[in-house]
Amino acid sequence: MALAADDILAIQKLIADYNHAVDVGDGPAFAALFVDGGSLDSGFNVIKGYDELRDFAGMVPSMAPGARHVVSNLSIDGDGDDATSRLYLQMWATAGGAAETKLVITGRYEDTLKRDGGEWRFVTRKMIPDG
């Protein structure tokens, strides 16, 4: 059975919550978006488990001041309590001041998702940089 519209909307919200949490460095909120033992492959390293995910998100504002994750072309498929999503990413950040916003990276995400305790969460999120 295909996903219900409410499930698709909940997954869209999960993805938006991810972007907002990582951009402001809210490590606890970011890590809570993943199942226990969930992982993020950033394209450069793999971050796994609540503590590593929390610490990673907490560092983003200092590594990429003014970071803004902008995603598009979201495609969600699934059945029951399992789903996948694919989407494109642009990450913008400031360099030397707010007036100098630049495109830092482009790529795509490939996600595996699971309904966990009634909420959709990431099992794995893989970022595949362009080029």
Provide a role label for each language-model segment.
Residues G27-M91:
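A solvent-exposed, acidic/Ser-Thr-rich amphipathic alpha-helical stretch
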Residues T84, T106-G131:
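Short beta-strand edge/turn micro-motifs at domain boundaries
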Residues M91-A95, L113:
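Beta-strand elements of well-folded, non-transmembrane domains
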Residues M1-P28, A32-D36:
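Short, low-complexity N-terminal intrinsically disordered segments enriched in polar/charged residues
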Residues K13, V71, R108:
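Short, conserved clusters of charged catalytic residues that mark active-site
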